[in-house]
């Protein structure tokens, strides 16, 4: 999506990519073969070097993944052929860390992340369960959650990337109240003056007075 321009809304912002030029050049060649989209890649070492030209992707080059690390032939692309690797995990983690640093320093106004392989970043010895936890750690945020947004609907999680069994164990009154407060503040921050917040029950019919579970009663 990035190399085909679908993830670069130039009518609303001036986008640049934090990543590796070698990987983006490979992806651009593969995209041209697959879909005919011809995108150029420009390496930059500072945000101030970005030119934001149509048809060109400014890539803040991290220099982690080299051309020799990409064995696939762009004429016969196999974008998912490598699977999860420690190198891929290290690269992905460093990209996310860098965009956080750029945002915290005021060099960029907002960040957007692509899908992240949790398996890969853990293979690289970065023990996080997802973007949310990385952002929280590097921004020193103690109370946080994930919000999914689509038009008029916002969905906010009491738990994030954990097993279903652990998710049930995390449904505690204090945590639910924290998430409600975070959701309220988050909605207001994006322009919803009076958020209407519905809280889902853990059990069917919110436990039906204990018939299907007592969490709603005891918590």
Where do the language-model regions lie?
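FAD-binding core/adjacent interface of flavoenzyme oxidoreductases
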Residues: 136-149
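Proline-centered loop/turn at the N-terminus of a beta-strand
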Residues: 14, 143-145, 154, 196
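Ligand-binding beta-strand-loop-alpha-helix segment within the catalytic cores
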Residues: 148-178
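Contiguous, glycine/small-aliphatic-enriched amphipathic segments in soluble metabolic enzymes
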Residues: 1-131, 174-219
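Conserved beta-strand scaffold positions in the cores of enzyme catalytic domains, especially
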Residues: 56-59, 146, 155
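Short secondary-structure boundary micro-motifs
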Residues: 84, 131-132, 140, 153
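A broad detector of the eukaryotic-type serine/threonine protein kinase catalytic domain
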Residues: 7, 140, 160-163, 169, ...
